[in-house]
Curated annotation (Swiss-Prot):
The active site is at 195 (proton acceptor). Homodecamer; pentamer of dimers. Belongs to the PanB family. This is 3-methyl-2-oxobutanoate hydroxymethyltransferase. It comes from the Bacteria. Its cofactor is Mg(2+). Keywords: Cytoplasm, Magnesium, Metal-binding, Pantothenate biosynthesis, Transferase.
Amino acid sequence: MNRGNQQKSAHVTTRRLLDMKEKGEKISVLTAYDFTTARILDRAGVDVILVGDSASNVFSGHNTTLPITIDEMIYHAKAVVRGVQAETSRAMVVIDMPFMSYQLSSEEALRNAGKIMKEHECDAVKMEGGRIVADTVKRITDVGIPVMGHLGLMPQSIYKYGSYRVRAQEGREAEQLLEDAKLIEQAGAFAVVLEKIPSKLAEEVTAQLTIPTIGIGAGSSCDGQVLVINDILGLNREFRPRFVRRYAELDAIIDGAVRQYVDDVKSGNFPSPDESY
């Protein structure tokens, strides 16, 4: 893959992620939806940038991830890939396949995965589901498209489950999740996201898989962690889930900066002579 960049750096690949798991080196994953954020994340050393269907929530303001379309996802992915290419080109870029872009049939899933890979230089696609998508994962990986799986809380199934509660807390559900993880691995997935499941279960899944597990609300035993960039930066004052650690409070900082700008414009304090031609 030709990635023009300013500072050449070893690009993270699926093989590299497997090596990281084998060596016990944790994998860092964050979401991005635009050029500027992707540049910063790549520069800061994030291993994997996920172009998440969470863009439906944090970028477009929808209540769920369901409304976002494949063309909208491709739009975001193109911007993210350009951002990575503008920096070190190190980060792997993975794009979520949106709701109903892969559920109808393996043929349609393959066609849409191919469309995603052809229209921008991302590295892989991500799909939610266990045994129900295993055949589709195999079909897609067989033609050379890397697939990341996603188990536990699956936001695209929110109307089926009715809430964002922790998943797989009961014995049979936990057993099924472990079985699903193994099926996804056997189908050819190179990694799997485990979202909002008990830490002990995530630890067991991680131990039994040879592919990396990426946790979100799944404890510290996973091979890596993923969070939504808006959440760690504190861009939503009202959203404070237990599994998110905030590293900044940008909502308040941006609010203060904008208010100062408005005041300076209203008072005539901006622009100053030094800011004029």
